[in-house]
Amino acid sequence: GRGIEPFFISSYNLPTHPQIYVLSNVRKDGKPIGRDGAGTHWHSDSTFTEKPSSVTLLHGVVVPARGGDTLFADTADAYERLDPSTKALIDGKRAIHRYQRKEFVFSGDRAVDEAERAEIERLKALRLAEEAATAPSPTAQRSNREPDRLHPLVRTHPVTGRKALYLNDEMTVGIEGMPDAEAVPLLHRLCEVATEPDRVLRFKWRQGDIVAWDNAATVHTATFTPPDEPRVMHRLTVEGTVPV
């Protein structure tokens, strides 16, 4: 069987159990105990690797009273809802996946109001200023250093054989053989189709919850967590295969 894989930036992994990746806005002695602000865009995990994670398991260790929900969308359903001309356009195409630093960007929740959006921008400015005054974060150090990966834009599920869109709203940066002026709007449109609000499942965490999902058939995003609401999540991912 496939094994558990550690997150590729070891600074964010639990020292006693390095396969566990820590996501948290909590700080100890002024330093973050995990990665803060990650995953607030629609994505499937580790698409910038040769063999992206097949399954993700997330454990709610400390759950905020406000924010920090996880939203899910079904990318197989999204593909099936596309019109025939769009399917013909994207079938057989390969998308370009690039690891980029994408922290404190926005909430993947389209329902965010202007007050919360302003709060997100304030937190983003604060975190970037903190980093500028110290050393670059491990994430920033790795930004754009990973090689680009080409994966099918329409992926066939390795178990069910069902076709699904395979994209990452921030790290899928283009389509092989297609001008960016055409590819980028197309990618954003496909993500919008997949994440139409009435097609999204919202999971509200309770302490101790564990959720597992299939990265070959879904995309997910975290919603914004206010900085005064502590959040600690432990993540495990299972090794995957080369997407086809």
Task: Label every model-predicted segment.
Residues G1-I210, N215-V244:
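Non-heme Fe(II) oxygenase catalytic core, chiefly the N-lobe of the double-stranded beta-helix
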